Amino acid sequence: MSMKAPRGTVDLLPEQSIKWQFAESKIKEICHNYHYQEIRTPLFEHTEVFQRGVGDTTDIVQKEMYTFEDRGGRSLTLRPEGTASVARAYVENKLFGSPNQPTKLFYFGSMFRYERPQKGRMRQLNQFGTEVIGSEDPAVDAEVMDFAMNIYKSLGLKSVKLVINSLGDQESRESHRNALIQHFEPHREELCHDCQNRLDKNPLRVLDCKKDRDHPAMGTAPKITDFLNEYSKTYFADVMTYLDALDIEYVVDPNLVRGLDYYNHTAFEIMSEAEGFGAITTLAGGGRYNGLVEEFGGPSSPGIGFGMGLERLIMALEAENITLPIDQQLDCFVANMGDESKLEATKVVKRLRDNGIQADMDYQKRKMKGQLKAADRYQSKFVIFLGDDEIEKQEVTLKEMSTGDQSEVSMSQLVEVLQEKLNGGKIYE
């Protein structure tokens, strides 16, 4: 038995985890500003949720899902994406009955896909996503894309671009579907096995094929934008009008096709143009899904959302050499001398922590020199020296590590003095 992490998974160690925490906290600030609320759905669902929601002709459903039977014989699947689960929860919990519409939701969570592991593509991936359900308004589409772009900009990323397209409504998609079949049918035998099947079930998927993307027929395939009816054209034009009003730069790519069946009308991706990012440049993707809620038995509830991989977000930050303003310094280290002072040190550390001051102490029975080295490694801003004399006098020696200044502080005033020296921003209430 291998005592290593399974293929396609990684351990997120503290030096990386702190970057994730910073990014996640920044994202949550933006969620608050845009008035989105968090939802948490199960890690696994009934397999039918993804078969019906994502589409049984997609690569995700046919090749990439982790599906198993429980002891009751029920087919369950680890979630490969977030939107289908949110739509299921929206219907099951009757969120459509709330007077506060549209419903604006966000989520963080692990997704699972059986893919060939490579840089930026893992079998367990961590995703942030948003869903706005209950409105078919071009202004909402623009808001969602603005939201996504704002995340990258707030973290200092500059080499990102927004790419958009319209997949049209059902009528437009049907016209495009028929044109695609006519176009690719003469080349059927030249296409890969998967695309031959897709041509019958969902020819739009042929355009998203990795194996056949260099086939000459791909370059001359009919574009969805040539088949948009008046409503779809007007809707897409209105989306672009709102993007222009928000000063959001974008590129229209008529070849942009999202890999999930539920998308219609607006589709978009955010890509990195940073040198050294690698072959996989997509950071986030999303679009509109007006029929998904009905697929789960709910009322007509148009929706739009996006998902972004947190692994790729961190990769993009590293590709642009962005150093996050993370304070990794410890507020205070309590150095003690002897068993009696160690007992007192535990009480001092607890009092500091209870008042919102980050504090630590020695648990390795180090001598004073070793404890000071530990304080240096923790980049501690202050060190409290606590020995028998300090306990008897009920005062400690407080040293500011950046200047070397030392002062005697009474136990009763320690918290107040330390909070003031730490700029008074961490008072516990």
Curated annotation (Swiss-Prot):
Highest taxon, organism lineage: Bacteria
EC category name: ligase
GO cellular component terms listed in the entry, alphabetical order: cytoplasm
UniProtKB keywords: Aminoacyl-tRNA synthetase, ATP-binding, Cytoplasm, Ligase, Nucleotide-binding, Protein biosynthesis
Coiled coil segments of this chain: none
Catalytic activities: tRNA(His) + L-histidine + ATP = L-histidyl-tRNA(His) + AMP + diphosphate + H(+)
Cell compartment(s), UniProt: Cytoplasm
Protein's name in the database: Histidine--tRNA ligase
Organism: Oceanobacillus iheyensis (strain DSM 14371 / CIP 107618 / JCM 11309 / KCTC 3954 / HTE831)
